[in-house]
């Protein structure tokens, strides 16, 4: 997970900071841990160690973990708790003062919501992380991706493979790359990263080094910022 955090630091800060960066760090850590563990609870909780405990991102995800234990059979109650505590975010202009939120905290929380309540069931995981709302294409994609790593490509249910197989060889618009091409590129990069970080690549298997997750630096978004009013502008408001 720490090697993934190093990449997230460079790539994530191209367009994000604070919680936006932490979203990449946390999801990257969960992907990394999914290669070495089949325990969803462990993956979710161990990956959180990469996030500073003082951050609101950490608090949000730890709350999801807490509410899951409090309401183990009711994902909707945990979702409702998230709405009450984290659905309004001052850094989301369209969502100020309304329950619309594209902030990384709550969307990462919806990934965790799907993983914890899905409990290894691919369809249930995808359903919950989608129905949670907000960024409801990326969130189930991340939840399904993490679970896919844990289960393995061949163990993804046939229902979810139907459309995928027909699309894997098709080129993305305005590019020369298909999903099959990206699989090969990602695989090659993964092997290079494994070797770079102390792992070993054999003919048909790899040996992964185990890293103890360490927290990245504290970087909090929009500290001391709170909107006083929400106002739209149109051409009649502009003095020409």
Language model features: what each stretch is:
Residues 4-11, 25, 164-165:
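Short, conserved phosphate-binding/catalytic loop or strand-edge motifs used
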Residues 1:
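Flexible glycine-/small-residue-enriched beta->alpha junction loops
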Residues 18-22, 38-43, 57-61, 139-140, ...:
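Flexible, glycine/charged-enriched surface loops at secondary-structure junctions
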Residues 9-15, 28-133:
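Accessory "access/gating" subregions that flank catalytic or transport cores
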Residues 15-19, 26-27, 106, 110-193:
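Catalytic phosphate/nucleotide-handling subdomain of diverse soluble enzymes
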Residues 54, 58-101, 150-240:
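Acidic, carboxylate-rich catalytic segments that either coordinate divalent cations
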């Amino acid at each position: 997970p720490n090697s993934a955090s190093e990449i997230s630091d460079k790539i994530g800060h191209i367009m994000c900071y604070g919680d936006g960066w932490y979203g990449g760090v946390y999801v990257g850590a969960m992907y990394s841990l999914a290669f070495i563990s089949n325990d969803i609870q462990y993956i979710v909780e161990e990956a959180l160690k990469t996030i500073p405990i003082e951050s609101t991102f950490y608090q949000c995800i730890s709350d999801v973990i807490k509410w899951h234990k409090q309401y183990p059979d009711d994902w909707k109650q945990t979702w409702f708790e998230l709405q009450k505590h984290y659905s309004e975010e001052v850094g989301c202009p369209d969502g100020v003062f309304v329950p619309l939120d594209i902030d990384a905290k709550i969307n990462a929380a919806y990934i965790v919501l799907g993983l914890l309540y899905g409990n290894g069931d691919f369809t249930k995981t995808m359903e919950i992380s989608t129905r949670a709302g907000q960024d409801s294409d990326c969130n189930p994609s991340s939840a399904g991706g993490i679970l896919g790593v844990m289960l393995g490509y061949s163990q993804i249910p046939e229902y979810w493979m139907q459309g995928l197989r027909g699309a894997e060889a098709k080129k993305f618009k305005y590019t020369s790359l298909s999903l099959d091409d990206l699989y090969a590129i990602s695989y090659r990069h993964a092997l290079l990263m494994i070797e770079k970080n102390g792992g070993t690549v054999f003919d048909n298997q790899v040996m992964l080094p185990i890293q103890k997750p360490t927290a990245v630096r504290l970087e909090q978004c929009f500290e001391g910022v709170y909107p006083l009013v929400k106002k739209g502008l149109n051409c009649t408001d502009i003095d020409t």
